[in-house]
């Protein structure tokens, strides 16, 4: 059997991400948080995603989410915990993603044997995720496995996503790239407009400009804010190392299992993206 190389980790992430990430743009989840008193969309995002860690202080969310403006995190945390407990938010989150997946994919699709097979494969991969040095992954590993299969699949992909994300932050720290600098570098790649990255992470113009200045001093950006060859190489090294650190669960699953999981989840992710429900900002709850 041919073992996966590090690039398989990136392939898995790109295909599987919409199925997990839908929860952050779920109108059903936002309505559930609002019913608990968390009516602010950004607050719902911070609180629901960090809820597996418990009612943590703002500093923990700043550390683990990494690229969001500190002031925005402090606006939301710990205020959220006075409105709703982590346990209640986790329940609303699971109910919300259940509702969103049923609305977008339909009961027939989520009840199909393909989804059950995908859940089994994803759970097998997630079993190889270790908690050491990966706090968000560790929190999700401690949660009970939900049923039915479409929720088990979502939970497994959430563990795998946080495992990769925690590793990515470790790579950024090792290269001395702070959260705002990481956003600037991402924007300079041209894949996502810089303005969207800045606004979605609540970064001020002053913070953004200072990050650009620091990257120019390192010769990673030129005078027009474009990536230099040095900057492009540095960012690519972070992405490559992220893939390496994310590889363990995919090695455990093996190449045939990885390929099959992507094959099974690809049409689900495509349907989620095509539904228009996958975006850059948490939704506002319905009025």
Model regions: which residues?
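Accessory, usually C-terminal, subdomains that scaffold auxiliary metal cofactors
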Residues: 202-278
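Phosphate/adenylate-binding glycine loop and adjacent helical scaffold
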Residues: 1-209, 281-287
